[in-house]
From Swiss-Prot:
Residues 76-89 have a biased composition (Pro residues). The keyword Ion transport does not apply. Residues 96-313 form the Fibrinogen C-terminal domain. It comes from the Eukaryota. Keywords: Calcium, Collagen, Complement activation lectin pathway, Disulfide bond, Glycoprotein, Hydroxylation, Immunity, Innate immunity, Lectin, Metal-binding, Repeat, Secreted, Signal. Disulfide bonds join 98-126, 105-133, 257-270. Ca(2+) binds at residues 249, 251, 253, 255. Expressed by the liver and secreted in plasma. Pfam families: Collagen, Fibrinogen_C. The gene is FCN2. Residues 1-25 form the signal peptide. This is Ficolin-2.
Length: 313
């Protein structure tokens, strides 16, 4: 009897504790996890109350670095920084060759170059130009701009070719109207014409001054007085005349003198000299279309050698 009563009291106490635990769990639901019941059934069930989270533990060891990500796009440049202090002065520069180099073959001669041949000079625009220098004739220092010696080069050319120049350093050439203009625009230049016939007789003609205008003025010839020469004067007639070629007729004739006499020259109406005519090797039956100098050997004789050259006066 007493035993049954004790069992009943114990069961009631257990049930009361269960209700109190559930009530406390509900009250703490906002801060702690839910109550969890485990077991099978009846009085065998166990009530587990999960406590509130404890204090954070100590940090764990640092993990290994991950792999590098892809490189991002380059951003816009930032604003320029402030200028730094001036740097030290550089070493003195070398003078440009065109400022100190020779301008003519006469300059070369004055600097001790006594051998005739091809040399480099510098035009007023600092452009280098390789020219044939005659250091032997009449005191030397002559710049040769026209040479005929063997007929190896055709001189019956168009305007553009005469403008640029043509021929060979080994033989015949025309230096080019642009180059002749640049050479004679530097100051007063005297002109010498040397002629040799097929019997090796020499003739020459000298003029006090010689200048060729630029292309805009059709390479107009500006010639000074005839000074001397065994060949006589066959160029004054052409003074103040424009240059003409087979494709650009600037003469005073109704026809084209360059075509009629197969050359290129400062034709008037038409010529008394034609040093850029055909290489006809001495006496020829055709009229005035050879390397002719009328006051020398007339219209029907073509010279073996012709050279035109300038030197500062």
């Amino acid at each position: 009897m007493e035993l049954d009563r004790a069992v009943g009291v114990l069961g009631a106490a257990t049930l009361l504790l269960s209700f109190l635990g559930m009530a406390w769990a509900l009250q703490a639901a906002d801060t702690c996890p839910e109550v969890k019941m485990v077991g099978l059934e009846g009085s065998d069930k166990l009530t587990i109350l999960r406590g509130c989270p404890g204090l954070p533990g100590a940090p764990g060891p640092k993990g290994e670095a991950g792999t590098n990500g892809k490189r991002g796009e380059r951003g816009p440049p930032g604003p320029p920084g402030k200028a730094g202090p001036p740097g030290p002065n550089g070493a003195p520069g070398e003078p440009q060759p065109c400022l100190t180099g020779p301008r003519t073959c006469k300059d070369l001669l004055d600097r001790g170059h006594f051998l005739s041949g091809w040399h480099t000079i510098y035009l007023p625009d600092c452009r280098p130009l390789t020219v044939l220098c005659d250091m032997d004739t009449d005191g030397g220092g002559w710049t040769v701009f026209q040479r005929r010696v063997d007929g190896s080069v055709d001189f019956y050319r168009d305007w553009a070719t005469y403008k640029q120049g043509f021929g060979s350093r080994l033989g015949e050439f025309w230096l080019g109207n642009d180059n002749i203009h640049a050479l004679t625009a530097q100051g007063t230049s005297e002109l010498r014409v040397d002629l040799v016939d097929f019997e090796d007789n020499y003739q020459f003609a000298k003029y006090r001054s010689f200048k060729v205008a630029d292309e805009a003025e059709k390479y107009n010839l500006v010639l000074g007085a005839f000074v001397e020469g065994s060949a006589g004067d066959s160029l004054t007639f052409h003074n103040n005349q424009s240059f003409s070629t087979k494709d650009q007729d600037n003469d005073l004739n109704t026809g084209n003198c360059a075509v009629m006499f197969q050359g290129a020259w400062w034709y008037k109406n038409c010529h008394v000299s034609n040093l850029n005519g055909r290489y006809l090797r001495g006496t020829h039956g055709s009229f005035a279309n050879g390397i002719n100098w009328k006051s020398g050997k007339g219209y029907n004789y073509s010279y073996k050698v012709s050279e035109m050259k300038v030197r500062p006066a």
